[in-house]
Amino acid sequence: MRASWVESRRGQANVSQMHFARQGVVTEEMAYVAKRENLPESLVMEEVARGRMIIPANINHTGLEPMAIGIASKCKVNANIGASPNASDAAEEVNKLKLAVKYGADTVMDLSTGGVNLDEVRTAIIDASPVPIGTVPVYQALESVHGSIEKLDEDDFLHIIEKHCQQGVDYQTIHAGLLIEHLPKVKGRLTGIVSRGGGILAQWMLYHHRQNPLFTRFDDICEIFKRYDCTFSLGDSLRPGCQHDASDAAQLAELKTLGELTRRAWAHDVQVMVEGPGHVPLDQIEFNVKKQMEECSEAPFYVLGPLVTDIAPGYDHITSAIGAAMAGWHGTAMLCYVTPKEHLGLPNAEDVREGLIAYKIAAHAADIARHRPGARDRDDELSRARYNFDWNKQFELSLDPERAKEYHDETLPADIYKQAEFCSMCGPKHCPMQTKITDEDLEGLEKVLETKSGAADLAGVKMEKES
């Protein structure tokens, strides 16, 4: 849908949404986002210019339906997919993409690390995707030298970064905030470095005894990004991997650097969001969100979870959705989903579904808590359908209509029960929603309630009704 929009921009030195917004131009993408978010176009333009909102929209991803990530927009959800050397293939990843979009993913990250032709998989995903696609280029940089850190040089990183831009990647996780001076701070951790990209760069610095090349070449990366309107997702290489390590010196030192890099990217009119933890106790989530806003000048915050306990492998879509809802309430702009397979293995299609639904619940709960206009409309509509025993309407309004209908039909599968005024929980005689209090029922109660002895009189009225 965007081919005609971007044609006139091709060849310009800077085609980023931030660049146009700062010139007072409302792009077609901004206008589209304004309609989706029910926001004034002028507000979208101002928020993009300020850096509080991003519209990840590479000019080479022409099939994209533009969306916004930021404090002024609805809380968004990202789904991770990707092939590994030990599991999955290209066809399965495209199927995961389609499933993720079906269940409401606002963006999708291709985290493929090997085992397939990475360029082929990525291109297939971008061509099939109406939502923004993100990547982590250091994975392919390492794969391009067959996993040999000692053979990886600075130009390899930049070559892969530009290749991803050329292919239409909308945002890239760039682990530029991890500095060589941060590495000693990791020693006291329980789980060290848990970011794959961060681990690669830590190994590179330890082997070469040189500063992080993504930091030293950051301005070069900005020059690449602004030619394609690729957005930075500044990676948190030192995110905590357990409750013990949350909010420690290593994490906060990197966060400070991420804030500095945010402002450097903005100086190039390049869009930025900042990634965050991770594993964080409930009582530290508000601090983490507010600290990021302070250090990073309110650039959109994008968190993985966070998980609020470490003892539930197999259920980490739940442990993390609890933290995600709270993070969203406090102002996080996008939540990266976690599946039941987290810490255990590569997720399959059903895991993608489970993780996404858990996170759509968390994001929606955050929007309600933040009193976003219209956020509760669907809840109220479903509640009316529930009160009126309109089963099909309830299924239709559910985040996962198939699952809702499946669970209802396990015990009452016949079509006649779609008109029944009960479910199998209460049965036909005990459902409290069958009690419909009407004006006729209330006749005479007003006067009783006005008297001093109203409570006693009312008890009598109730007894008479019951008899």
Swiss-Prot record:
- The species this protein was found in: Synechococcus sp. (strain WH7803)
Cofactor binding description: Binds 1 [4Fe-4S] cluster per subunit. The cluster is coordinated with 3 cysteines and an exchangeable S-adenosyl-L-methionine.
Functionally, this protein is described as follows: Catalyzes the synthesis of the hydroxymethylpyrimidine phosphate (HMP-P) moiety of thiamine from aminoimidazole ribotide (AIR) in a radical S-adenosyl-L-methionine (SAM)-dependent reaction.
Which family does the entry's similarity section mention? Answer: Belongs to the ThiC family.
Lineage, opening ranks: Bacteria, Bacillati, Cyanobacteriota, Cyanophyceae, Synechococcales
Q: Which InterPro entries match?
A: ThiC, ThiC/Bza_core_dom, ThiC/BzaA/B
**Pathway(s):** Cofactor biosynthesis; thiamine diphosphate biosynthesis
- Keywords attached to this entry: 4Fe-4S, Iron, Iron-sulfur, Lyase, Metal-binding, S-adenosyl-L-methionine, Thiamine biosynthesis, Zinc
State the source organism's domain of life.
Answer: Bacteria
Where is it found, in Gene Ontology cellular component terms?
cytosol
> Can you list the disulfide-bonded cysteine pairs?
none
Gene Ontology BP annotations: thiamine biosynthetic process; thiamine diphosphate biosynthetic process
Q: Which cofactor does it need?
A: [4Fe-4S] cluster
The residues that the entry says bind Zn(2+) are H279, H343
What reaction does this enzyme carry out catalytically? 5-amino-1-(5-phospho-beta-D-ribosyl)imidazole + S-adenosyl-L-methionine = 4-amino-2-methyl-5-(phosphooxymethyl)pyrimidine + CO + 5'-deoxyadenosine + formate + L-methionine + 3 H(+)
* Pfam families recorded: ThiC_Rad_SAM (PF01964)
Assigned EC number? 4.1.99.17
Indicate what this protein is called per its UniProt record.
Answer: Phosphomethylpyrimidine synthase
Q: What class of enzyme is it?
A: lyase
Q: Give the GO molecular function terms.
A: 4 iron, 4 sulfur cluster binding; carbon-carbon lyase activity; zinc ion binding
Binding residues annotated for [4Fe-4S] cluster, in chain numbering: C423, C426, C431
Residues engaged in binding substrate: N80, M109, Y139, H175, S195, R196, G197, D236, S237, L238, R239, E275, Y302
